[in-house]
UniProtKB/Swiss-Prot annotation:
Source taxon at top rank: Eukaryota
Region Disordered, residue ranges: 1-32, 338-393, 452-529, 564-586, 633-693, 723-802, 823-926
Protein name: Storkhead-box protein 2
Biological process (GO), any one: regulation of transcription by RNA polymerase II
Amino acid sequence: MKKTRSTTLRRAWPSSDFSDRASDRMRSRSEKDYRLHKRFPAAFAPQASRGYMTSGDVSPISMSPISQSQFIPLGEILCLAISAMNSARKPVTQEALMEHLTTCFPGVPTPSQEILRHTLNTLVRERKIYPTPDGYFIVTPQTYFITPSLIRTNSKWYHLDERVPDRSQCTSPQPGTITPSASGCVRERTLPRKHCDSCHCCREDVHSMHASTLQRKSAKDCKDPYCPPPLCQVPPTEKSKSTINFSYKTETLSKPKDGEKQSKKFGLKLFRLSFKKDKTKQLANFSAQFPPEEWPLRDEDTPTTIPREVEMEIIRRINPDLTVENVMRHTALMKKLEEEKAHRSKAGSSAHHSGRSKKSRTHRKSHGKSRSHSKTRVSKGDPSDGSHLDIPGEREYEFCDPLTRAPREGCFIIEHKGDNFIMHSNTNVIESHFPMTPEWDVSGELAKRRTEMPFPEPSRGSSHSKVHRSHSHTQDRRSRNERSNKAKERSRSMDNSKGPLGASSLGTPEDLAEGCSQDDQTPSQSYIDDSTLRPAQTIGHQRAHIPSASYKEVCIPEIVGGSKEPSSACSLLEPGKTPESMPSYGELSPCPAKTAVDDYFQCNTSSETVLTAPSPLGKNKEDHDTLTLVEGVKKLSPSERQTPHSSREPVGHKEESPKGPGGGPAASGGVAEGLANGRLVQHHSAEPSSLDKRKEIFSKDTLFKPLHSTLSVNSYHKSSLSLLKSHPKSPVDTLPGRCEKLEPSLGTSAAQAMPPSQRQQEPGGNQEASFDYYNVSDDDDSEEGANKNAEEEKNRDDVGTMQWLLEREKERDLQRKFEKNLTLLTPKETDSSSNQRATHSARLDSMDSSSITVDSGFNSPRTRESLASNTSSIVESNRRQNPALSPAHGGAGPTFNFRASTDPPTSEAEKLQKPSNCLQASVTSV
């Protein structure tokens, strides 16, 4: 009965005592063992055990008060007493509680201080009361968590409770001492354990008084049979150390220790099993209590880690469209689009890639970032970003082509195929890399665009074309918002109509084959197809010949550095003079084209782009240097930028005069140079400014391309064909060949000014320029050889570029018409700078539409103006992308002449005017 009662009444005073005691016993045992081993001889435990066994068995059972005590829940009584004392604002200490119990319950035996302390600790543990230096207080919702924190502070709940109660109990008697003692207890488990033991002993004394209490105590103290003796011995130390309460405990324990131990022992034995069970239950309850106590804390912690399901539900409720599925779908779509684009580029670039991978990979290794940026650019729509993430294989493959590969190497290596090609490519790639690193955002934007408009995806090249045009008409904006403009460019590159149409027009298989056969540079141009497809290469060479002499000086070193054909570059320059019609082209391109570009993109890069135009000339080392210098000039000052620009521009004028038969080619070369410059500058500038330049080049390409197309009207028709084919095949290696070819072809073009043969010969430069425009699609860029170009065409078809091919056919026809008009306009443009500027404004307007139009998906109706814009943009992009392409164009004498034409008067102002002319030509062609 008593056992049952005690178990049942645990929550009553005895039961709570017992529960606490049971826990205490368990604790006491571990603590006691620790304490015994630490401070007490083993003998104490045995003695205690013996004492418990002998005297403890009978006394607790025989105690009469037990029945009453069991029925009197000490814990509840204490709670009532504490509540009453709190209401009376009396400090609740153990002594005060004893007095209160004695006063309020005169007939009930007063519990010993040890029992009282133990019960108070139990209540604290149960969070019914909480101790403070001022005494105990009833726990309220506001103070409910004070106890847990107190308990948590202590190493053990029991000890904490004990210590805390000690504080409270001693607070009124000895608040200062007690508080430190409590702290000490918390610090020293040994003392608290001793306290527990003492408490148990005290409880045992009380148990002697109250059988039930004693039994309960014994049950709990059974854990610590030895504990009481050690407690007695240790208590003095504990008293001083832990608290006065401890001292009380010690005193109590020492007095009734023997009897209590015996009674405890008996009670523990009697109730040991039941208490163990109860203890286990209590421990479970105790643990169960802990979670409730901690639940709020857990809840507080949980919000920081909301379950995935809940989080997703919240997201769904906030934005139903924003789901993991949708996000994954979006990501998958973007990946698919990029993969399609990459496949497209790879389809035509697989061969290119093998060839290009040999050199380009070396370059990539040296300029992995450049390549990455190239990819970014491709994604962005910049051919120089052929290695763009979107189309990593695209540009790379373009470079890979034996011919295209040289340009790629040009982008990556200075030594491959003449430093001007390689250096330019290197610079291009580096430039792409450094600027492109920022442009990765653009690639992301392109991915977004693709996600938004997946169908434009087919027009990778067209996206480049659109990007170029976007750059052209947004050149000023680019100065302000290069990043945003790049995003726009990419979005434009998303337009299928622009890239595909341009690519189709320029990249007809005929054009590809023609370009390939015509000039190795064409592949570079093809590679550069992004914005500076081929005009960029021609311009690259011209760029190398900032002046004729300058180009020779620079271009020769560059070519020598490239070891492709220094003489080729020089020859190109000089053959450029031979086809000074090409110089006319150069004039038109450098002065008008660049002017158009600069005028068109009057942003900081207008002169820089012009300056850059010569740099593509030197895709060779000189191109790289020029490009770098051009970039530096771009960065340093418009004057410096204009200086190469001016040099080129005079050549442009010189060449423009001879442009008679070769005027178209010269213009094409000039455009190519401008494009090459713009593109090369972008590639060369491995700096943020390079990015700007590239962006500027894109815009300028838009300007340059139409001009280039116009200039290379004759060569552009064939150029578009041969360019398309030669573009992919023109690499850095091809560029020297192109230079050689272009030199004779430029000579021929000089003789023929605009004859198809010149166009064919000049495709590296002029045709490439025209091809560049059409070769906006990365596929063309990917194709590195003439075969690569043809493959590129096929690849585009494979990539679903049939529309592009058709568009390219249309674009080619338009481009031819435009080039014819442009050729006709070429003389005009030099003459009518103001008209050209007006045209430039018109073209800027038309460029906006054309950038829309050029993308084969969105504005299939292409105005010649848009074609010109795209061509310039593509040529520029190609030139930027493929330094070799620029040299390929540069390979054409006109291109170099363009650069060589260093008309001081044709500097910034003339450049601006000539861009106006270029714009006018573009508008007129439209």
